[in-house]
């Protein structure tokens, strides 16, 4: 609507002392910054006074605190939430009683306020003793066809091994005041054992029905590949048959394997 691209990314305040900070202190000093663009190629940092410096100078910080660790912004359904922009942020272990995913709303993509004082998801929503880890980049999408919000969460099963990391999903009809559906696993039906789904998003397509895009992560070699789904539940790697989806953009540009995260 605004004909602008918004890019949100995590930062730390300049007061961080990496050598002497404990983990909880670092989490509290994290911030979320924003950059905008008219073409999606060249971005600039807006001068905002939401969180100015100690000298009163503007910054491009739009959020701070533990939930800035994975503050994810998306377009919500305006009629259901009253906000054009919705964001979620997960807290994991900073304050045990507060562990969960919190919901925020904004009219302009810059000024975010909590939509609820309590988290919309906590560890009590998990099926068993192996809880979701709210420190990951959990993602949300509004599904206009099904009229539900999808929430994808990282989860560790009780079996050791990197490949046992998995992604779960649940749905809200009302993400502000409603209750979530039971958690269920997202499946990869043609991937090798050492890939798990990460960073799922719903993409609207003009040529076909909307589809879901995921970027699976592999261990111990950190490589990104492409996975696609029509239902948001079962994903395939489209290497064998790309006609039903789109070409995997990582095949030729991935480069040599790397052990860096």
Protein language model features and the residues they cover:
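Carbohydrate-active catalytic/glycan-binding domains of CAZyme proteins
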Residues: 1-261
């Amino acid at each position: 609507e605004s004909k602008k691209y918004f890019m949100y990314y995590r930062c730390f305040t300049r007061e961080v002392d990496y050598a002497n900070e404990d983990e909880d202190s670092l989490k509290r000093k994290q911030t979320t910054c924003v950059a905008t663009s008219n073409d999606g190629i060249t971005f600039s940092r807006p001068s905002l006074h939401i969180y100015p410096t100690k000298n009163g100078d503007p910054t491009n910080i739009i959020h701070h605190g533990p939930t800035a660790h994975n503050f994810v912004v998306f377009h919500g359904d305006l009629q259901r939430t009253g906000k054009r922009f919705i964001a979620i942020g997960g807290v994991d272990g900073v304050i045990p009683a507060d562990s969960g995913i919190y919901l925020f709303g904004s009219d302009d993509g810059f000024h975010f306020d909590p939509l609820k004082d309590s988290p919309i998801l906590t560890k009590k929503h998990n099926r068993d003793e192996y809880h979701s880890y709210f420190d990951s980049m959990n993602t949300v999408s509004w599904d206009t066809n099904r009229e539900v919000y999808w929430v994808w969460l990282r989860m560790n099963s009780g079996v050791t091994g990197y490949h046992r990391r998995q992604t779960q999903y649940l749905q809200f009809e009302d993400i502000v005041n409603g209750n979530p559906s039971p958690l269920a696993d997202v499946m990869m039906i043609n991937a090798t054992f050492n890939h798990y789904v990460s960073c799922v998003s719903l993409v609207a397509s003009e040529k076909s029905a909307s589809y879901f895009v995921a970027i699976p992560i592999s261990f111990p070699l950190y490589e990104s590949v492409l996975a696609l789904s029509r239902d948001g539940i079962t994903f395939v790697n489209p290497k064998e048959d790309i006609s039903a989806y789109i070409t995997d953009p990582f095949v030729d540009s991935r480069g040599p394997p790397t052990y860096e995260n």
